[in-house]
Curated annotation (Swiss-Prot):
It comes from Thevetia peruviana (Yellow oleander). Optimum temperature is 25-37 degrees Celsius. Cysteine protease able to degrade azocasein and benzoyl-arginine-beta-naphtylamide (BANA) in vitro. This is Peruvianin-1. InterPro entries: RmlC-like_jellyroll (IPR014710). Its EC number is 3.4.22.-. Optimum pH is 5-6. Homohexamer, possibly consisting of a trimer of dimers. GO terms for biological process: proteolysis. The keyword Protease applies. The keyword Iron does not apply. Belongs to the germin family. One of its GO terms (molecular function) is cysteine-type peptidase activity. Signal peptide: none annotated.
C-alpha cells in the first residue's frame, strides 16, 4: 500500500552544487509558503 500523500512533494534545491538526473530535493523542514 502506498503511504499517504503528505510526503509526496519535492521542492527543488536550485542552489545545490549537485545535479543528479535533476535537482535534489530541499529539506522539507525549510519549506515556506512562498515555495509553492
Amino acid at each position: 500500500a502506498d503511504p499517504g500523500p503528505l510526503q509526496d512533494f519535492c521542492l527543488a534545491d536550485l542552489n545545490s552544487p549537485l545535479f543528479i538526473n535533476g535537482y535534489p530535493c530541499r529539506n522539507p523542514a525549510l519549506a515556506i509558503s512562498d515555495d509553492f
